[in-house]
Amino acid sequence: MNEYTFIQVDVFTDKPFGGNPLAVFPDAEGLTGEEMQSLAREMNLSETTFVLPPATAGADFKVRIFTPAAELPFAGHPVVGTHWALAHLGRVPLSGPITQVRFELGVGVLPADLHVVNGRVERVVMTQDRPTFHAILGDVTELADGIGLSPEAITETGMPVQVVSTGAPQIMGSLRSLAEVQALGAGKLNTAVLNRVCRAAGTDIA
């Protein structure tokens, strides 16, 4: 049986056990897509990434992104986390205050700038495609039920709830207050309802 190393990183935080966790397999060559999906299911995190040699000119690495349920063409949190992980492992030569690295993803080759301070990556700035705007959700009752809030928490902002994509479509909306945003959490989410809303909108809960 082959052995593959992985590391787990917390993205969007500077504190241990904070942010959004991600599993990264930095040397995934030899794994099939089915095996990657099985490993992502076993990790049971929002996403797991698998790093491969690039197949496209101009790319430094090929990265495949999986949720426990499916492969994604693109997602921000795993891309940022994988850039940091590869730099941390010494896989990216850090030259000067900014080092650019290009990932081959399901949506194409996208660059990111690694901002370096005292030899360490302090920030990852990712470039995405221009946004495209799609369907507006007219009735947000089911969406509100899925996130554990009242429909009014969404509708009283006066802002539309719309599917927007910079590579992977997502439902974008706003809430009345920061307190309502901070109150969101896994304990209040109804994933069955959210999956149904996302499928109807042509997107994914991740």
Residues of each region from the PLM?
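Active-site proximal loop and beta-alpha junction motif in alpha/beta enzyme cores
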Residues: 1-74, 80-206
